[in-house]
Amino acid sequence: MTLRWTMDKVGAICRTVEDCAVVFDSLRGPDGKDDTVVNAPHVLDEHAGLAGMRVGYIEREFRQTSEDASADEKKQWPAYQRLLDDALDLFRKAGVVLQPIALPDLPARSIYALLNAEAGAAFDDLLRAGGHNDLAGKHPGGRANQLRATRFIPAVDYIRAQRVRTLLAQQMNALMATCDVFLAPSDSASVAVTNLTGHPALTLNAGFVEGMPRGLMITGRLYDEATVLRVGMAYQRATTWHAIHPPLA
């Protein structure tokens, strides 16, 4: 279902990175029905080593939990941080060059006017027919009211947000010129950024805290899913988190 034309992305949810690679290989490339698809080269060498690869990590997010974290998440942070540090140690032993990085200092979340405007356009027929009144969740932050609010996004705000989005993409490309991929917790603020810039990412199970899986995210350069997948495969070959499942009884 279309939600936001310039941000919607199709991805796979699989047990292993190898499975993700198979699904991605089937999905990628033009099919003649979507003019936004790019016929970019994709060469995956899953057995290539990681030695010498430049791997960044968002230093702030490896050292403190998100400001938006719940009380439970803040309580669990020390255990999660140990899992993240273990992941860094694993990559360090694999011979990668780890380097701390910081995200571009631009208000990624504040330009979500783009996201909301595109959602309003995608559901324009529903809005005009009054179908949003039948949606569940009538509270102020519910989907129905979110769609109504898209009617009142000023054109000036939308255009300015597009300009900031362009700057954000330029700064992300400059950042990615310094590293092959970068690592972050799965609840990283980078998801707001890459949602706008299109940089590919892969989330892996990095362990468990109080019985709940916690993730490690690998983000790569534009159209370089192959490197993201290769790094993810190396991580899963060195760990067993992805093979753990809850008891069925």
Regions found by a protein language model. Give the residues of each.
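Flexible, acidic loop-helix segments that line cofactor/substrate-binding pockets
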Residues: 35, 40, 53-54, 73, ...
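Short helix-loop capping/hinge segments that flank enzyme active sites or metal/cofactor-binding pockets
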Residues: 49-69, 113-169, 205, 210-215
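Short, well-ordered beta-strand elements
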Residues: 12, 212-224, 228-232, 236, ...
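Acyltransferase
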Residues: 76-102, 123-136, 158, 162-179
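Short amphipathic alpha-helical coupling segments at ligand-binding clamshell hinges
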Residues: 19-23, 83, 161, 212, ...
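An extended, acidic, His-containing surface patch that forms the Zn2+-binding/catalytic region
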Residues: 170, 174-200
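A short helix-breaking turn/cap at a secondary-structure junction
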Residues: 1-81, 238-249
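Short glycine/serine-rich loop segments
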Residues: 1-27, 185, 195-217
